From Swiss-Prot:
It comes from Mycobacterium tuberculosis (strain ATCC 25618 / H37Rv). PANTHER family: COENZYME F420:L-GLUTAMATE LIGASE, PTHR47917. GO terms for molecular function: coenzyme F420-0:L-glutamate ligase activity; coenzyme F420-1:gamma-L-glutamate ligase activity; GTP binding; metal ion binding; oxidoreductase activity, acting on the CH-CH group of donors, with a flavin as acceptor. Residues 1-244 are annotated as: Coenzyme F420:L-glutamate ligase. This is Bifunctional F420 biosynthesis protein FbiB. The gene is fbiB. A divalent metal cation 1 binds at D109, D150.
Length: 448
């Protein structure tokens, strides 16, 4: 291959730093490490557990020893430290904190501290790493890299591992894009989190119960490009796992209704038939009276049939408007609005079918029964529009067939009691659009 390799292809040592004190707020971490590891050399990587940095920087919070009270405070601190909750599992919260770190409990930790304390992460771990690096250079005359670590879980895999939350003096990432492997294959997306690999390796020496919060990785070819651990964080817009599964499903449910927009310009991309069929199947679960199925969707799949129907409807609409006395230019503008049904990749006509409707001897109840069935079909239409939207398909409901019911039945050879309730243009939107804003209820929600 060509280009620098992050691996050493030689022996790497991981050395414990023995004899460090129990750190307390105000302690000089660089002085303690220099005293315990005077053997540090240029090019070493000093790997430090974030907990001792937190202790030295006074990031300890007094806590009650009563387990319930301690847990209550811990949860309050998590709430304070987190900027958002990604996922919940029983009592465990996966959060993003102000640093952009995604981990359990926003880094609030009660391990390896006194029972009357809880620890928070350092305010700026990258700055802490730079300070420690400068202090070791001043005291020992060596140029080292520093990695500050914390324990994190991983998506897809059980168990935790240490990762870098602060870094100074090394390239935290190695991007292999464009580099060729020994077989001549170009690497496309490979980017190695070098600082995280160092953090995980050092944890094999530091452990969790060894009272060894600092280790030194020796023999690794360090290159300093000025990057810090912040470069390891993937911003939310680029994160494929921005939410936990349950939370993503919940957000999807909340946004489903707002995805529906009236789309009037479609791309030429074909619409997969199975998506339309699946959306119709969901739409038919809409509420209906008397356990009936009053909705039918007529899918105009044959281009000639669609064109013939729309041409006849256009002629009728133009004739009606002429009878109304509208000027020719106004008529053509009104008629042109129906062009969407010609242009849309797919068109579906919702129908009211009175199967199962109750018969009454009086007009009032007969009209009410018809209204009830009309509402049911309207619910199915809205359900279809939403079902299409959640599948990435745009749609627009057009009322035109209501004004030409006899014509529609005749052209499509449908029973005389089937009532067209508009037409639905379907396709992929020509331009993407975001969620609709909810309409303020205000005067539209009447309270009695």
């Amino acid at each position: 291959m060509t280009g620098p390799e992050h691996g050493s292809a030689s022996t790497i040592e991981i050395l414990p730093v023995i004899g460090l004190p129990e750190f307390r707020p105000g302690d000089d971490l660089s002085a303690a490490v220099a005293a315990a590891a005077p053997w540090l050399r240029d090019g070493d990587v000093v790997v430090v557990t974030s907990k001792v940095v937190s202790k030295c920087e006074g990031r300890l919070v007094p806590a009650p020893e009563d387990p319930e009270q301690r847990d209550r405070l811990r949860r309050k601190l998590i709430e304070d430290e987190a900027v958002r909750v990604l996922a919940r599992k029983d009592r465990t919260l996966i959060t993003e904190n102000r640093l952009g770190l995604v981990q359990a409990a926003a880094g609030v930790d009660g391990s390896n501290v006194g029972r009357s304390e809880l620890a928070l992460l350092p305010v700026d771990p990258d700055a802490s790493a730079a300070t420690l690096r400068a202090g070791l250079r001043e005291r020992l005359g060596v140029t080292v890299a520093v990695v500050i670590t914390d324990t994190m879980g991983r998506a897809w895999r059980n168990g935790q591992t240490d990762a870098a939350v602060g870094a100074a003096g090394l390239a935290v990432l190695r991007n292999y894009a464009g580099v060729r492997d020994p077989y001549g294959n170009e690497l496309v997306v490979t980017e190695v989190a070098v600082a995280d690999e160092i953090a995980a390796a050092a944890d094999l020496v530091k452990g969790k119960l060894t009272a060894t919060p600092v280790a030194v990785v020796r023999g690794f070819g360090v290159s300093d490009d000025g990057s810090t651990a912040r470069q390891l964080l993937r911003p939310g817009a680029n994160d494929l796992f921005w939410l936990g599964t349950a939370e993503a499903l919940e957000l999807g449910r909340q946004q489903a209704q707002l995805l529906r927009r009236s789309v009037r310009r479609f791309s030429t991309d074909p619409v997969p038939g199975d998506l339309v069929e699946a959306a119709v199947a969901e739409a038919l679960t809409a509420p209906a009276p008397h356990h009936t199925r009053p909705t039918r969707f007529v899918w105009l799949q044959t281009p000639a049939i669609r064109a013939r129907l729309l041409d006849r409807m256009k002629d009728k609409w133009r004739s009606d408007l002429t009878s109304d006395g509208l000027p020719a230019d106004a008529i053509e503008r009104r008629v042109a609005r129906g062009q969407i049904l010609y242009d849309a990749p797919e068109v579906v006509i919702p129908m009211l079918v009175p199967d199962g409707a109750h018969s009454y001897p009086d007009a009032a109840r007969t009209d009410a029964e018809h209204t009830m069935f009309t509402v049911a079909v309207g619910a199915a239409v809205q359900a279809l529009l939403v079902a299409l939207a959640v599948r990435g398909l745009g749609s627009c409901w057009i009322g035109s067939t209501i004004f030409a019911a006899d014509l529609v039945r005749d052209e499509l050879d449908l029973p005389v009691d089937w009532e067209p309730l508009g037409a639905i243009a379907i396709g992929y939107a020509d331009e993407p659009s975001g969620l609709r804003d909810p309409v303020p209820a205000a005067d539209l929600l009447i309270l009695k």
